[in-house]
């Protein structure tokens, strides 16, 4: 029987299935952080249950921590409570924790792959919507709620209904200067933010294969932003090269056996997908969101669309509301839009390749006078260490940016990195919802190079026209 990659992953993890009932899946890897885990551990204590498989769960601190201090005692309010609770709960249960005193600590979706915890063929869950990131390795990875976090801790299983399958093929090669972030934003622009609803998406095509693992993680990270349950990219030699010798990756004969199995994790040639979407890579230009969801996105060289010209009444109403909030008018050229802040970071774009791309733009330049602040936040302590080894931190600081410690930072208004009211930000994060980066903050999603350029020129520019150093 021919199967898609998703079907192979799903079927191979079924623990129990009966007619008329939702299948129960075995979970290979459970990642936790300080925000969605405290109530789950409380639930275990109330029910007098233990963590079933301690060695399958790993924790880190990322969402609410400060990127300015590494001392828990200097945290305030809810952030301090959450961090201390995670520390207490992991010590009590024996779960491995990468806390803020270690260089292995980082954003959960950066730390997991770095440590080799993310492997092809796995089922991976986390109490975070961007768990789809790990699908870049050919793993079935998706976000879960706090009650499900408790269930996985207690049983190492999860009830999960089958999703539909979608194939998104990006044909050919992208032009110079076009990144994984541009590819996924262009995809969401075509499908809309609801285009993948009810589906698990497999990304394929030459443009996807050409991406590094870091680029592939960027693509899968934002699968949720088109409404998909998860995103997948079949593993290949690029995947294996990235994983080899990672701390938790198989070693010796186990590695050889694992690679032999991983090579089978491909959709069969005649596999049927419920939905197929194709894009031509050559048509993708640098992308900038203009509204309040990632599907409201255009090329930097285009003008903001007129809601009155939209045939769909729901889309029209959404666009009108978005433009009112974002403070822009239909017909505006994006290259005329000035920014107040720049954020380079998040689980979408805080890896070493992202920082190198930003540094290439910022080297030898200075922050524009109208830009109040540029935050550069590495995704983990190991990324920070590598960036400093390469001297990237000095480039950022010389350009007028702030070089921070690892954390989710300004991706979400849950810590002390926030936009001021009605400030406009060029951000490498994954969501531009109303208030996402702070009360009444205005967010435009872009690639790291585009964000860095906005910081240097004070407005959006076409990165293809910027000399790199």
From Swiss-Prot:
PROSITE patterns: ACONITASE_1, ACONITASE_2. Signal peptide: none annotated. It comes from Haemophilus influenzae (strain PittEE). One of its GO terms (biological process) is L-leucine biosynthetic process. Binds 1 [4Fe-4S] cluster per subunit. Heterodimer of LeuC and LeuD. The gene is leuC. Pfam families: Aconitase. It catalyses: (2R,3S)-3-isopropylmalate = (2S)-2-isopropylmalate. It is an enzyme of class 4 (lyase). This is 3-isopropylmalate dehydratase large subunit.
């Amino acid at each position: 029987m021919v199967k898609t990659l998703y079907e192979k992953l799903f079927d191979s993890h079924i623990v129990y299935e009966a007619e008329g009932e939702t299948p129960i899946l075995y979970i290979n890897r459970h990642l936790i952080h300080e925000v969605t885990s405290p109530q789950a551990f409380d639930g275990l204590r109330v029910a007098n249950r233990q963590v079933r498989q301690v060695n399958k769960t790993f924790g880190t601190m990322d969402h609410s921590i400060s990127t300015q201090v590494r001392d828990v005692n200097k945290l305030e309010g809810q952030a301090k409570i959450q961090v201390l609770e995670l520390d207490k709960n992991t010590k009590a249960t024996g779960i491995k924790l990468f806390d803020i005193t270690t260089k292995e600590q980082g954003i959960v979706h950066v730390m997991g792959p770095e440590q080799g915890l993310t492997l092809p063929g796995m089922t991976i869950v986390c109490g975070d919507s961007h768990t789809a990131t790990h699908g870049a390795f050919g793993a079935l990875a998706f976000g879960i709620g706090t009650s499900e976090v408790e269930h996985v801790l207690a049983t190492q299983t999860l009830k999960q209904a089958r999703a539909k399958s979608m194939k998104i093929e990006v044909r050919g090669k992208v032009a110079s200067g076009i990144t994984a972030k541009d590819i996924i934003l262009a995809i969401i622009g075509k499908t809309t933010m609801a285009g993948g609803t009810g589906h698990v998406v497999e990304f394929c095509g030459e443009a996807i294969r050409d991406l590094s693992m870091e680029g592939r993680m960027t693509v899968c990270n934002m699968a949720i932003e088109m409404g998909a349950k998860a995103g997948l990219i079949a593993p290949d030699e690029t995947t294996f090269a990235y994983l080899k010798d990672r701390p938790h990756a198989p070693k010796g004969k186990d590695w050889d056996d694992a690679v032999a199995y991983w090579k089978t994790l491909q959709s069969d040639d005649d596999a049927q997908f419920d939905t197929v979407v194709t894009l031509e890579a050559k048509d993708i230009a640098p992308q900038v969101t203009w509204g309040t969801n990632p599907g409201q996105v255009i090329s930097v060289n285009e003008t903001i669309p007129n809601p009155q010209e939209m045939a769909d009444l729901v889309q029209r109403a959404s666009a009108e509301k978005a433009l009112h909030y974002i403070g822009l008018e239909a017909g505006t050229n994006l290259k005329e839009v000035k920014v107040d802040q720049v954020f380079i970071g998040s689980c979408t774009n805080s890896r070493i390749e992202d920082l190198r791309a930003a540094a290439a733009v910022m080297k030898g330049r200075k922050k524009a006078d109208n830009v109040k602040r540029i935050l550069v936040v590495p995704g983990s302590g190991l990324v920070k260490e590598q960036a400093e080894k390469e001297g990237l931190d000095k480039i950022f600081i010389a350009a007028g940016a702030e070089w921070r410690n690892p954390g989710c930072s300004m991706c979400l208004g849950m810590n002390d990195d926030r936009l001021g009211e009605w400030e406009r930000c060029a951000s490498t994060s994954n969501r531009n919802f109303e208030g996402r980066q702070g009360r009444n903050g205005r967010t435009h999603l872009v690639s790291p190079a585009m964000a860095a350029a906005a910081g240097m020129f004070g407005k959006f520019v076409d990165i293809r026209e910027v000399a790199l150093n």
